C-alpha cells in the first residue's frame, strides 16, 4: 500500500473548486473518521501544502490563500498532534509528517520557537520510518536527502495527481 493513496475526490476538488474547498474536504473527512491514517495524512498534507505555498510558493496572496492560512495552521497542528499521539510509531505518519515538520516546524501551533529541535525531530521521524520500511522508495528518497547517495523517485511512482503528490514528485524526482 502506498504512503499516499490515490484520492480522486481531492484531485477533482483542487482543480474544480479550489484549494479552500480541498482543505475543508480533507479536514472534515478526517474529523469524521479520526482513526483513518490516510484521511489524517491527506488533511495534514493539504493544510501544509497550502500554508507553504501561501508563504513561499507560486500561488502567493494573489490567489486568496491568505484567507485560509488560519484554517491551514489549525488543521495542520491538529492533525500533527493527533497523529503523534495515535500514529506516532507508524512509518507512513513518521515519513510524511516528519518531512513537513523538518522543513517548517513553525507551522505548528505548539511550536516553541526551537527550530533546530523540531527540525531534528522531523529528521528522526523520517529515519525511523526508513528503518521500518527500508524497501519503500518514497521513504528511502526522503531519508536519502540527508546522505550523499540521493535516491530519486521514478516518474510513475505516484498513481494520483493531487497537489502534494505533484510536490513530492518535483522534490524527489
Feature annotation, model-predicted:
Residues 20-24, 46-82, 102-132, 146-162:
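Short coil/linker segments at helix-helix boundaries
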